[in-house]
Amino acid sequence: MKHIFVLSQFIAIALLSYFGNVLAFDWYVMLQLVVVALGIWAVRSVGENNWSVYPTPNEGSSISATGAYKYVRHPMYTALILFFLPVVLRADGFFSWTIYGVLILTLIVKIIFEERQLIKKHTEYTHFKKVTKKRLIPFVW
């Protein structure tokens, strides 16, 4: 199951990258640079040994509630979604919006699956969910 999530995610990213203009030099690139910084902050906040593209916890992993994880439980996914938003806005076609929707839907289902795995492995994740209430967007979801 975990391979299906990752495969779907990377196919959507590859299609958006192939058919869209990932790094055009327009004002959208500023958003992308800020989002790259968010992604780096998220990786640094969680620690090098705690993150993976797979929605299953690594051996020896722990729960991070600092840095970006103070605001949302999945800031790397937030960064990924926001990074590709300008790509879709530049392309502005039905196909790119559909693939973007598939990417977001894949990440939402992946988050739900991942959180179930985290609760099984880390009992403190239930407390973390109470402290950091939102999954992707502060104050929203």
What do these predicted ranges mean?
Residues 1-65, 82-141:
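Membrane-anchoring alpha-helices and their flanking helix-loop junctions
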Residues 70-78:
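Histidine-centered phosphotransfer motif of kinases
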